[in-house]
Design a protein with these regions (language model features):
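AAA+ P-loop NTPase catalytic core and its hallmark functional loops
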Residues: 1-152, 168-180, 184-208
């Protein structure tokens, strides 16, 4: 269904264009404009099977070159102005790894927690709350310990989004994030290290 697929139509099935096929057609008709196709949690599916025969066409050296589709016998190409962005959650161990055939067709960029970014510090400064500053520093310390843990790594670090989107900064809100989001996660991370869990419970609760 990603490229093409048979879907119910009346009393039977009809071959219909899939979302990526339609997207490429639209991009092909407007090649002066970049088109970005974003796949969230790309490693939830078997991308080699999903792209199938088109796997070669997403390579930069084959952009614009036509391939006859097995679905309908018609030529198809991936335009040069199509950019495929795949997002992965490397911390979810239940998900499939990206195989090498697909991996070599992509460049990779790690998105680290944005606690040190200019945007987050502007957000932090807008509250001018000493407790909030202190809590974020402790979270950064926590992330350092998570990142160096050989059983976890940087993919398991606490993201800044837990602390974003607030119009008002209160101790009640910060405590709720710690108690109901951060600490339960640490209990999963270090389920066999109760002393480490207790240590970070004391540190984070001690901010208040």
């Amino acid at each position: 269904d990603f490229i093409m697929g048979y879907k119910p139509s009346g009393e039977g099935f009809e071959l219909q264009n899939g979302i990526f096929y339609k997207f490429c057609q639209k991009a092909s008709n407007n090649q002066e404009v970049p088109y970005f196709f974003i796949i969230d949690e790309i490693n939830r599916g078997n991308m080699s099977k999903i792209f199938g025969e088109l796997l070669m066409l997403i390579e930069k050296d084959y952009r614009g070159k036509k391939l006859t589709l097995a679905y309908n016998g018609l030529p198809f190409s991936v335009p040069k102005n199509v950019y495929i962005i795949g997002m992965m959650n490397t911390a979810d161990r239940s998900l499939a790894l990206i195989d090498y055939a697909l991996r070599r067709r992509f460049s990779f960029f790690a998105m680290e927690p944005g606690f040190s970014s200019d945007g987050f510090w502007q957000y932090l400064d807008s509250f001018n709350d000493d407790t909030f500053y202190a809590l974020i520093e402790k979270i950064k310390d926590l992330n350092f310990e998570i990142a160096k843990d050989p059983s976890l790594g940087s993919g398991f670090c606490i993201g800044h989004s837990y602390f974003c989107g607030q119009d008002e900064c209160t101790d009640e809100w910060m405590q709720s994030v710690v108690e109901y989001d951060i600490l339960p996660m640490l209990e999963e991370y270090w389920f066999d290290e109760p002393a480490k869990i207790q240590k970070w419970q004391n540190i984070l609760r001690g901010v208040f």
